[in-house]
Amino acid sequence: MNHPSELKYARTHEWVKIEGDLVITGITDHAQDELGDLVYVETPEVGSQVTAGEQAGVVESVKTASDIHAPVSGTVVEVNTDLEDDPDFVNEDPYGKGWIYKIKPDNIADVEKLLTNAEYEAGL
């Protein structure tokens, strides 16, 4: 599995990348592999508030559906609209083209409370 060291991770299998004052998030390579081929991604609405650990969206595969949890609290400022037509981007490139949404976090320091890649992989 590929879990880049520069990212942070939630125990619920989401990854986080800081980009300026925003946080980009998606599901991990492990999560997409377990789910199988994705057929639908339900993103949160732009402008909505998300709470760390709470459901922010859903991914559906040919096998099952799974909640996407917010890794940090904040306001959703952008969603990856490319996933509407190509949810398989999450399978093909979970840390790149398969990002799901961007958050303006209430407190950017909350990202540091998330797991390193080594901590995340140890919990798999």
UniProtKB/Swiss-Prot annotation:
Alphabetic keyword roster: Lipoyl
GO BP: glycine decarboxylation via glycine cleavage system
SUPFAM superfamilies (alphabetical): Single hybrid motif
Cofactor note: Binds 1 lipoyl cofactor covalently.
Listed transmembrane segments: none
Cofactor(s) required for function per UniProt: (R)-lipoate
Function of the molecule: The glycine cleavage system catalyzes the degradation of glycine. The H protein shuttles the methylamine group of glycine from the P protein to the T protein.
Assigned protein family: Belongs to the GcvH family.
Annotated protein name in UniProt: Glycine cleavage system H protein
Organism of provenance: Acinetobacter baumannii (strain ATCC 17978 / DSM 105126 / CIP 53.77 / LMG 1025 / NCDC KC755 / 5377)
Organism lineage: Bacteria, Pseudomonadati, Pseudomonadota, Gammaproteobacteria, Moraxellales
Gene field: gcvH
